[in-house]
Swiss-Prot record:
One of its GO terms (molecular function) is GTPase activator activity. It comes from Rattus norvegicus. The BAR domain mediates interaction with the exocyst components EXOC4 and EXOC8 and is required for the function in cell migration. It also mediates the interaction with PLXND1. It is found in: Cell projection; Cell junction, Tight junction; Cell junction, Adherens junction; Cell projection, Phagocytic cup. Residues 1-275 are annotated as: Interaction with CGNL1. The record marks R312 as: Arginine finger. The gene is Sh3bp1. This is SH3 domain-binding protein 1.
Length: 689
């Protein structure tokens, strides 16, 4: 038994990948062998297609027409529409459209149900029979033939072995071997009968298998027609659906033809402005300058040239969206956006960026880059002029218009903080960008470098707008924005005449009285008096001019949070004279003596008053008794105290410091260093006491 199984495994192992088996290959010709190889792939194909096609059905499989239609999603949609248009006015356009849509969805659902029923009958069921009945029967008969052939071969090998054993027993002879010979002969006869029976079965199974192969080869074309019929059914379904949709659409358009021709719907069409090429936009509207460019420029010229951070600060998304819609639908009502110059600047940048081709054209991109790479200013300017002359006429006109405006904007850089460099940084990438090419990181790096060169090109165009684009320009080209007038710069002479002169009190000529020295209390000892007379270290003084002080005060004021003031209508008047120091504070009657230092109020901190760099004058020392001369030491004259001798100079110097900001401003020489009082010898103190 184990030998038979091992032999069977060997036969299966010898079966090639082509599907040929040694049991059946000897009975089949070359044509039938090829047909046999197509059995397994055909069975798998029919099974997979049937499974996936069954999943595409939307209705209930095997149900009748009415049940199938109720389960379709299109029928559910039709029911929802029928319930919805009952609440609407049947004479309204929406009610009529919804009613028509409900009817067409119901019709499409029935067409779909018919399509699925035909698909099941003509495609799904034949494919199921082919994959589950016909081809499995042929493959089953093939396996039976293989088993019979294997058993027949095994029986033949046993028969040959038994015949060989019977011949060897006859050659040996003997009485005892006669009985063995008879048993062997009977076994051989039995094996011959079994072999004849198996041979008959093999022949019968072989004939049936060959007939199945011939039948499959003749019906293989009809099996292929299943897939052709599938496409025909689908085409017929879509054709019927399209016919129904065309009929419904024609009827729906006829019903709404009067509504479409009403005055409300025949108003000025919603013209496309953003995202359209410049040439198409100009041809459709019959303009020389693009509508967004002219409208935004006039809005900014009206109110916005002195807005700080223009084109750099972003506007609100909702305001910008509403502005773009208004510009496309009703450009005459744009004056309401004058109060938001940042939204207007954002709309201009958005238009330039959404152009299919940049305003400075992609065809001249390399020429712009070559002109920007020139180091010599004259050569670079000449190259840029040459590239500008090769622009298309509509691009040149709009670029000239825009550069003239940006040059005017740069003239207000002291107020709006937008220099030509800042304007080029924020607008350059919107005027010119490299052509889109799919590449590696190296090309991306090159694009970033080119953006820097684009900024350089735009900056030079702004700085030399009068040279590259000579002649004056009228910004109101179309005349539809007549209500937007550019801001007129006020004349400085008229402003100075209208404003009254402001008198500034000059305190520099009035000398500040020198505080009188305060006498020390009598109870203070000599040592304490000596320590109190020592000069204290003064804080370092930083000399600032009145202009620097004013700038510092304005900077500190700018850093603090404060509500935005109303926008001025004219620039502030120019100061007629330089600022002078504030007037000296007058002491009220009954206050402390002038010698006592007073603290300044907080409102004066940060003004031109500064702390003196020279210490206050020391009080005069009380008269000391004459020292007794020591007998051992020579008599030495007592020098006068340097503090006492220098006191008048210090007083004068301090007064000059307060008036003019420092001792350097009085005489132009640094002050003489003050020597501290010298300590007296301990022996002399004791003798004096």
């Amino acid at each position: 038994m184990m030998k038979r199984q091992l032999h069977r495994m060997r036969q299966l192992a010898h079966t090639g990948s082509s599907g040929r088996t040694p049991e059946t290959a000897e009975f089949l010709g070359e044509d039938l062998l090829q047909v046999e190889q197509r059995l397994e792939p055909a069975k798998r194909a029919a099974h997979n297609v049937h499974k996936r096609l069954q999943a595409c059905l939307q209705g209930q499989s095997g149900a009748d027409m009415d049940k199938r239609v109720k389960k379709l999603p299109l029928m559910a949609l039709s029911t929802a529409m029928a319930e919805s248009f009952k609440e609407l006015d049947p004479d309204s356009s929406m009610g009529k459209a919804l009613e028509m849509s409900c009817a067409i969805q119901n019709q499409l659902a029935r067409i779909l149900a018919e399509f699925e029923m035909t698909l099941e009958r003509d495609v799904l069921q034949p494919l199921n029979r082919l994959s589950e009945e016909e081809l499995p029967a042929i493959l089953k008969r093939k396996k039976s033939l293989q088993k019979l052939v294997s058993d027949w071969n095994t029986l033949k090998s046993r028969l040959s072995q038994a015949a060989k054993n019977s011949g060897s027993s006859q050659s040996l002879g003997g009485g005892s071997s006669s009985h063995t010979h008879m048993a062997t002969a009977n076994k051989v006869e039995t094996l011959k009968e079994d072999e004849e029976e198996l041979k008959r079965k093999v022949e019968q199974c072989k004939d049936e298998y060959l007939a199945d192969l011939y039948h499959f080869s003749t019906k293989e074309d009809s099996y292929a027609n299943y897939f052709t019929h599938l496409l025909e059914i689908q085409a017929d379904y879509h054709r019927k659906s399209l016919t129904s949709l065309d009929t419904a659409l024609a009827e729906l358009r006829d019903n709404h033809s009067q509504a479409d021709s009403s005055p409300l719907t025949t108003a000025a069409p919603f013209s496309r402005v953003y995202g359209v090429s410049l040439r198409t936009h100009l041809q459709d509207l019959g303009r020389d300058i693009a509508l967004p460019i002219e409208a935004c420029v006039l809005l900014l010229l009206s109110e916005g040239m002195q807005e700080e951070g223009l084109f750099r600060l972003a506007a609100g998304a909702s305001v910008l969206k509403r502005l773009k819609q208004t510009m496309a639908s009703d450009p005459h009502s744009l004056e309401e956006f004058c109060s938001d110059p940042h939204a207007v600047a954002g709309a201009l940048k958005s238009y330039l960026r959404e152009l299919p081709e940049p305003l400075m054209t992609s065809d001249l991109y390399d020429d712009w880059m070559r002109a920007a790479s020139l180091k010599e200013p004259g050569a670079r300017l000449e190259a840029l002029h040459d590239v500008c002359s090769r622009l298309p006429q509509e691009n040149f006109n709009n670029l000239r218009y825009l550069m003239k405006f940006l040059a005017l904007l740069a003239e207000e850089q002291d107020v709006n903080k937008m220099t030509p460099s800042n304007i080029a940084i924020v607008l350059g990438p919107n005027l010119l960008w490299p052509p889109e090419k799919e590449g590696d990181q190296a090309q991306l790096d090159a694009a970033s470098v080119s953006s820097i060169q684009v900024v350089g090109v735009v900056e030079v165009l702004i700085q030399n707008a009068d040279t590259l684009f000579p002649g004056d320009i009228n910004f109101s080209v179309s005349g539809i924005f007549s209500g937007l007038a550019p801001q007129e710069k006020p004349n400085s002479q008229q402003v100075s005449e209208e404003l009254a002169p402001v008198a500034v009190p000059a305190t520099a000529a009035t000398p500040t009285p020198t505080p009188a020295p305060t006498p020390a209390p009598a109870s203070m000892t000599v040592k304490e008096r000596t320590e109190s007379e020592l000069p204290k270290p003064a804080s370092p003084k930083v000399s600032r001019s009145p202009t620097d002080t004013t700038a510092l005060a304005e900077d500190m004021t700018r850093k603090t949070k404060r509500p935005a003031p109303a926008r001025p209508t004219m620039p502030p008047p120019q100061p007629s004279s330089s600022r002078s120091s504030p007037p000296a504070l007058s002491l009220p009657a009954g206050s402390v003596s002038p010698g006592t230092p007073q603290a300044l109020p907080r409102r004066l901190v940060g003004t031109s008053l500064r702390a003196p760099t020279v210490p206050p004058p020391l009080p005069p020392a009380p008269p000391q008794p004459a020292r007794r001369q020591s007998r051992r030491l020579p008599v030495s004259p007592c020098p006068a105290s340097p503090v006492i001798s220098n006191m008048p100079a210090q007083v004068d110097q301090g007064a000059a410091t307060e008036d003019r900001g420092g001792p350097e401003a009085v005489g132009g020489h640094p002050p003489t260093p003050v020597l501290p009082p010298q300590p007296r010898p301990r022996g002399l103190i004791s003798e004096t006491d």
